[in-house]
Design a protein with these regions (language model features):
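Long, compositionally biased, intrinsically disordered segments
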Residues: 22-241
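Bacterial Sec-dependent N-terminal signal peptides
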Residues: 1-28
Length: 241
């Protein structure tokens, strides 16, 4: 992983389900997996995968068959390239949920996973500041209780790619969605996140303020950030959080 950087989010549902971008008040979350497949002298090749999670009970819009992500230069926020990713087998799958604490009623809580991959690798030239990837959509799940306006808040799924000239460097793989990815009321939960790093680097996790979407998608399902990291606006917490 080295200095690969991701933004993570933990948000609480009314039924104390923890989630991991348009779907109309349906998005639960997502992540990027970036794999360097070839490190060249002036550029490198990457395979980019996006995983999306949606509320399959309350969500109105289905998983899109394709998404277009943007890749931008850090420091300039200039678009380097866009990339179309395709939904595997053109269909999502339902995430199995449940443990000894709580087994959700699938008629009430049901999460769909969509996995998106490109048809070809993405080539990025050496650039000293590196790049960031963004996919955005709206809106979040209306049952989220710790955000002030979740059904109008979008999401930016985000990752940073260091300068390709630094050598072999891939992102972590978050593995399967945890079956017990929720907290029960007045209870604690401890689980091992099934994350691995192909480069053997150490992994550190942090809870961060969730990223909203940018000011309108101008590059497919993406838009350039502004200013310094984290480049995109954050969501406003509800009172008390």
């Amino acid at each position: 992983m080295k200095i690969f950087l991701f933004r993570f989010l933990i948000i609480f549902f009314t039924l104390f389900f923890v989630s991991k971008s348009t779907f109309a008040t349906h998005i639960v979350g997502g992540d990027f997996k970036v794999t360097m497949t070839n490190n060249g002298a002036t550029s490198s090749n990457y395979d980019i995968q996006l995983r999306l999670y949606r509320d399959d009970v309350n969500g109105i819009v289905n998983m899109p068959s394709t998404v277009t992500i943007g890749i931008y230069q850090i420091g300039t926020n200039i678009l380097e390239t866009t990339k179309v990713l395709y939904l595997d087998n053109n269909i999502g799958t339902i995430v199995p949920l449940g443990d000894a604490c709580f087994s959700p009623n699938p008629a009430v809580i049901r999460v769909e996973e969509g996995v998106y991959n490109g048809l070809t690798s993405t080539v990025l030239p050496n650039f000293s500041m590196g790049y960031y990837i963004q996919y955005q959509t709206c809106c979040r799940n209306a049952s989220v209780t710790n955000l002030a306006d979740p059904d109008n808040d979008g999401i930016s799924i985000f990752a940073i790619i260091p300068n390709p000239a630094l050598g072999q460097n891939s992102s972590p793989d978050f593995g399967n969605y945890p079956n017990d990815a929720y907290f029960c009321l007045n209870s604690t939960n401890s689980f091992i996140w099934p994350v691995t790093d192909p480069d053997g680097d150490s992994l550190v996790f942090s809870l961060v303020q969730p990223l909203n979407d940018g000011n309108g998608a101008t590059n497919g399902n993406s838009t350039s950030g502004t200013g310094a990291y984290p480049f995109y606006p954050t969501c406003l917490y509800a009172v008390g959080y």
